[in-house]
Structures are given as structure tokens and as C-alpha cells.
């Protein structure tokens, strides 16, 4: 024989826990609401059919149809509220169900009591089952009024107040936002894909309307430019000028190597200018042509090609004068070196003569 394990008796707390779980199941699983609503409607239909078959259409038991009808009406109302898609329709269905339930129960209780009074009045009415059923239905109506209607309306007011508080808090939070978060929110709206397409078309139209002019390298002509600016611009073209000069004559490389410091030496006197002109006239015609081409290349690199200078002869003359000044300064430096060498040699000769005079003659 198999041993029979005794089943421990369930405590009232466990029963209460099971009942609460059964009643709160639709809250945890929303799809169970439809099952509960359909179950209420089915129970009410079964009650009505069974009462009619049992009484065969006559007798006091027909009054029990009233609670079945109330339960069926409650199930239909809850099912409509659950099937409603929009939030507003759900609120309307819930309100109708919460308000109509106590009235339905109260009407059922009143019908049962009046039927008991009609059958037999006096003290016997307290023992009539219709009266007892009516009083019980009236108690259910009062409980539904407190537990369903009043609680639903109070929760509805709390929900409205909570929504208002959330809106106020959201408005206050948006008003106290820092500028960076506001700018980021505006950028998110501004750089949306729809607005980006519009921005691209607007930019293209704006670019078509504008007339862009090329920015020249130097806005001033050679006459208005300072020597420092000319020096900085001529250094960029020094390599090209050196190649051209070396292909024409061997002397041109020496002159072009000193072109980087040409514009730093201002003219000293009219005498130096005349000397430089005489030295330039003594050079050959080919050498002068090469210098002119190199000078023209340097000037074209400085001034924009769209705006040629009004007096090209003066620009060439300025370049020639600067180079002639260089040559004159080179000659002056050579003369100074020769003078220093001659003075040093004369001092050495004088010192050697004095030493020879001081030596005694030996016979």
C-alpha cells in the first residue's frame, strides 16, 4: 500500500492571496480582460436559461433572473470598454459601467422587495426569500457604489490632476533649460532630412544669385607697393629667374643671386644713379634683353594679369635702377676693400722700413 501524504490545511491568508491573484490577473495580463468579460456574459446567460427551465415560466423563482441580467449588463459594458481603441472611448465606457452598476443592482433589489410585499405583508415578509434576496442585492448595490463608482471617480480626478502637474513640470523644465540644450534641440529640428533638402536648394539659389570675383594676389600696383612687399614676392620667383639667366649668360646668375636683397637698399644720391646708368649702358644687348624678360616675369608674378600697369617703362626702369644700384654698391664695396688692403700694405711697408733703419750696420 502506498503511503498517503496528508494535505496540509490552507490558511486564510493563502486563500486571500489566491483570490486577490484571481481578481488582479487582468491587470497583470491585459488579454485576460476579454476572457473575464465573456465569462461574465456566459454566466448570466446560463443563469437566465436555467431559471426559466426550472420554473417553467411560473413561480417566484423567476425573480432570480434580475441579478443574472445585471451580471450580463456588467459583462457587456466591460467588454465594450476593453474593445474600445481610443483613450476617450475607453474612458466613456468605464464611466458608464461604473455609474450604471449600482443603479442596476438597486433596481433589481427594489423589484425583489416589492414582489415579496405583494405576495404577503406583515411580519411574514421577513421570512420571504424574495425579500432576503432583495436586501442582499441592495447591499451589493451599496458596495458597488462605494468600491466601483466612488473609487473610479476619485481615481479619475487624481489622474487629471497628475496630468496637469506633469504638463506644468514639463513647461517649467523647458523654461529653465540652458542655452546649449535649446540650441541642440533647434539643431535637431533644423537638420532634419526634410529641412536639409530645402537648405540645399536655398544655398544653390543663393550661390547663383551672387557674383563671385576672383581675389587678386596683390591689390596695389608696383608703384604703390612697398619694398618689403616686393622683396617677399620676388623671392618666390627667384628660382625661375635664375634658370633663365643661366641659360643666357654666365654673368646673369651672379646678378640674380643678389636679387633677394634688392628692394631693401634705398637710393643714396644722384651721383650713384648716374654711375649705375653708365654701367648699364656698357653691357651687351643680349644681356639687357634677358634682364628685361626676367624683370617682366617678376612683375607679372606680383601684379594681377587682368590689371596691367599703366606705365610699363617706369616699372622696368625701377627694376633696372634697383639692379644698377646693386652693382654700384658692389663696386663701392670692392673699392673700400681695395683701399683697406692698400692702407694695410702701406702700414706694413712703413713698419718694415722703420725696422730696417733701427738695425745697426755691422762692418
Swiss-Prot record:
Residues 322-342 have a biased composition (Basic and acidic residues). Belongs to the chlamydial CPn_0443/CT_005/TC_0273 family. It comes from the Bacteria. Residues 246-268, 275-285 have a biased composition (Low complexity). GO terms for biological process: symbiont-mediated generation of symbiont replication vacuole. It holds the Pfam family DUF5423. One of its GO terms (cellular component) is plasma membrane. Residues 232-245 have a biased composition (Polar residues). It is found in: Cell membrane. The keyword Translocase does not apply. The lineage of its organism: Bacteria, Pseudomonadati, Chlamydiota, Chlamydiia, Chlamydiales. Keywords: Cell membrane, Membrane, Transmembrane, Transmembrane helix. Residues 232-363 are annotated as: Disordered. Its main location: membrane. The chain crosses the membrane at residues 34-54, 60-80, 91-111, 112-132. It is a multi-pass membrane protein. The keyword Membrane applies. This is Uncharacterized protein CT_005.
Amino acid at each position: 500500500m502506498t503511503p498517503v501524504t496528508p494535505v496540509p490545511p490552507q490558511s486564510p491568508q493563502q486563500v486571500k492571496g489566491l483570490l486577490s491573484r484571481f481578481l488582479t490577473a487582468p491587470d497583470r495580463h491585459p488579454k485576460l480582460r476579454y476572457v473575464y468579460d465573456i465569462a461574465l456574459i456566459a454566466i448570466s446567460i446560463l443563469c437566465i436559461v436555467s431559471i426559466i427551465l426550472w420554473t417553467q415560466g411560473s413561480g417566484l423563482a423567476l425573480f432570480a433572473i434580475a441579478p443574472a441580467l445585471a451580471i450580463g449588463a456588467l459583462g457587456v459594458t466591460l467588454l465594450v470598454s476593453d474593445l474600445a481603441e481610443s483613450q476617450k472611448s475607453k474612458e466613456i465606457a468605464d464611466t458608464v459601467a461604473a455609474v450604471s452598476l449600482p443603479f442596476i443592482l438597486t433596481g433589481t433589489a427594489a423589484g425583489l422587495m416589492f414582489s415579496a410585499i405583494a405576495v404577503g405583508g406583515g411580519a411574514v415578509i421577513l421570512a420571504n426569500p424574495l425579500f432576503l434576496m432583495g436586501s442582499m442585492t441592495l447591499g451589493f448595490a451599496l458596495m458597488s457604489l462605494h468600491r466601483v463608482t466612488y473609487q473610479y471617480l476619485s481615481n479619475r480626478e487624481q489622474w487629471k490632476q497628475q496630468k496637469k502637474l506633469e504638463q506644468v513640470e514639463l513647461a517649467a523644465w523647458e523654461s529653465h533649460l540652458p542655452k546649449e540644450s535649446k540650441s541642440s534641440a533647434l539643431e535637431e529640428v533644423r537638420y532634419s532630412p526634410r529641412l536639409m533638402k530645402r537648405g540645399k536648394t536655398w544655398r544653390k539659389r543663393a550661390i547663383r544669385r551672387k557674383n563671385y570675383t576672383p581675389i587678386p594676389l596683390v591689390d596695389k600696383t608696383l608703384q604703390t607697393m612697398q619694398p618689403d612687399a616686393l622683396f617677399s614676392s620676388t623671392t618666390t620667383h627667384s628660382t625661375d629667374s635664375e634658370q633663365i639667366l643661366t641659360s643666357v649668360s654666365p654673368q646673369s646668375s651672379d646678378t640674380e643671386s643678389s636679387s633677394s636683397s634688392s628692394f631693401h637698399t634705398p637710393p643714396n644720391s644722384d651721383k650713384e644713379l648716374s654711375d649705375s646708368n653708365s654701367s648699364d649702358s656698357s653691357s651687351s644687348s643680349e644681356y639687357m634683353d634677358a634682364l628685361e624678360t626676367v624683370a617682366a616675369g617678376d612683375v607679372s608674378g606680383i601684379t594681377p594679369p587682368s590689371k596691367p600697369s599703366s606705365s610699363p617703362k617706369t616699372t622696368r626702369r625701377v627694376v633696372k635702377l634697383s639692379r644698377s644700384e646693386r652693382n654700384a654698391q658692389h663696386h663701392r664695396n670692392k673699392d673700400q676693400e681695395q683701399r683697406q688692403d692698400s692702407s694695410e700694405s702701406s702700414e706694413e711697408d712703413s713698419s718694415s722700413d722703420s725696422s730696417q733703419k733701427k738695425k745697426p750696420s755691422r762692418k
